[in-house]
Amino acid sequence: MAQMTVQVVTPDGLKYDHHASFIHAVTKDGQIGILPGHINLIAPLEVDELKVRRVDDESHVDWIAVNGGIIEVKDDFITIIANSAERDRDIDVSRAERAKQRAERVLEEETKRVLEKATKSDRNDDVQRAQIALRRALNRINVGTKIR
């Protein structure tokens, strides 16, 4: 059976190294399925899951959370370089939930802050428009009352 070697590398070292018959990844340009004999390529990855169907057990799929990075396919050797990557079995789900809640809280606070700034900016725009309208009116009055 044709196979590929798949390695996932992070700054912390090699995170995954197995033989595979199929890989599914999400690149910046969309989803990609890779089989043995795939053309050589390099593509930037989205923050998404990586699906690897292993050769030693066709019914077994390894799922890896990849934090962006790049994928290189060259002669049935697939290298994924990412800032971080975790296999499904290594992920602490409760810790991930806490991180999600923190991120949502920060996002909500930042959204409120942006909206408050936008409101102030809108107010500033309203003030500026009023000042311009006042200057135009004063100018028209001044010109209109000139002695001819």
UniProtKB/Swiss-Prot annotation:
Membrane found in the keyword field: yes
GO cellular component: plasma membrane; proton-transporting ATP synthase complex
Pfam families xref list: ATP-synt_DE, ATP-synt_DE_N
Molecular function via GO: ATP binding; proton-transporting ATP synthase activity, rotational mechanism
InterPro entries: ATP_synth_F1_dsu/esu, ATP_synth_F1_dsu/esu_N, ATP_synth_F1_esu_C, ATPsynth_dsu/esu_N
Transmembrane segments: none
Membrane-topology descriptor: Peripheral membrane protein
Top-rank taxon: Bacteria
Localization per Swiss-Prot or TrEMBL: Cell membrane
Keywords: ATP synthesis, Cell membrane, CF(1), Hydrogen ion transport, Ion transport, Membrane, Transport
HAMAP family the UniProt entry points to: ATP_synth_epsil_bac (MF_00530)
Sequence similarity: Belongs to the ATPase epsilon chain family.
Subunit architecture: F-type ATPases have 2 components, CF(1) - the catalytic core - and CF(0) - the membrane proton channel. CF(1) has five subunits: alpha(3), beta(3), gamma(1), delta(1), epsilon(1). CF(0) has three main subunits: a, b and c.
NCBIfam families in the cross-refs: ATP_synt_epsi, PRK00571.1-3
UniProt function note: Produces ATP from ADP in the presence of a proton gradient across the membrane.
PANTHER family documented for this protein: ATP SYNTHASE DELTA/EPSILON CHAIN (PTHR13822), ATP SYNTHASE EPSILON CHAIN, CHLOROPLASTIC (PTHR13822:SF10)
Name used for this protein in its record: ATP synthase epsilon chain
Organism taxonomic ancestry: Bacteria, Bacillati, Bacillota, Bacilli, Lactobacillales
Gene: atpC
